[in-house]
Amino acid sequence: MIAQIRPALVMIVLFTILTGLIYPLAMTGVAKALFPAAAEGSLITRNGQVVGSALIGQNFTSDRYFHGRPSATTTADPNDASKTIPAPYNAANSAGSNLGPTNSALIDRVKTDAEALKAENPSQPVPIDLVTTSGSGLDPHLSPEAALFQVPRVAKARGLSEDALRRLVSEHVEGRLLGVLGEPRVNVLALNLALDESGK
């Protein structure tokens, strides 16, 4: 019986070392050598302090900042552990709402958000990414159209000209990967940090 168990135990130990230690350390080493910023989480620092990651959105609510996409992430309700409560951009619980297009809760939320945005900028159609959540709930990017839609509100709150803000948005548009993959996008955190650095 020991002769039968021994090979199985050897394989468990061998593959535990191989897949649990050697492979992760090797991949981390390769990532740090080839993509040092990405291997550390694409962290953004200002004055020696980490202010966020270029890969994870943040919940900006002040009129002085550009807002990201709605986030459907949640956290445990402190009053009832069997329930959850909204916690926008909670990276510990990344997920979409899983509500289908005919779900009344989703329809009501989108209508409410769209009406609030339309009141903010009645002359422009509301970009779809300002009322829809991403699959992860942590999307750090907006379409250039969604960022430009918010220019009047941010300009008014900061006392800046709309033209200056449009230029700032244009400077922060990231193109398609390799010229063909994905869509042009704006990283909301990078744009808001540039706003703060403008001094107004």
From Swiss-Prot:
One of its GO terms (molecular function) is P-type potassium transmembrane transporter activity. NCBIfam families: kdpC (TIGR00681), PRK00315.1 (NF001454), PRK13999.1 (NF010603). The system is composed of three essential subunits: KdpA, KdpB and KdpC. Keywords: ATP-binding, Cell inner membrane, Cell membrane, Ion transport, Membrane, Nucleotide-binding, Potassium, Potassium transport, Transmembrane, Transmembrane helix, Transport. It is a single-pass membrane protein. It comes from the Bacteria. Part of the high-affinity ATP-driven potassium transport (or Kdp) system, which catalyzes the hydrolysis of ATP coupled with the electrogenic transport of potassium into the cytoplasm. This subunit acts as a catalytic chaperone that increases the ATP-binding affinity of the ATP-hydrolyzing subunit KdpB by the formation of a transient KdpB/KdpC/ATP ternary complex. It comes from Methylocella silvestris (strain DSM 15510 / CIP 108128 / LMG 27833 / NCIMB 13906 / BL2). Pfam families: KdpC. One of its GO terms (cellular component) is plasma membrane. The chain crosses the membrane at residues 7-27. InterPro entries: KdpC (IPR003820). The keyword Cell membrane applies. It is found in: Cell inner membrane. This is Potassium-transporting ATPase KdpC subunit. The lineage of its organism: Bacteria, Pseudomonadati, Pseudomonadota, Alphaproteobacteria, Hyphomicrobiales. Belongs to the KdpC family. The gene is kdpC.
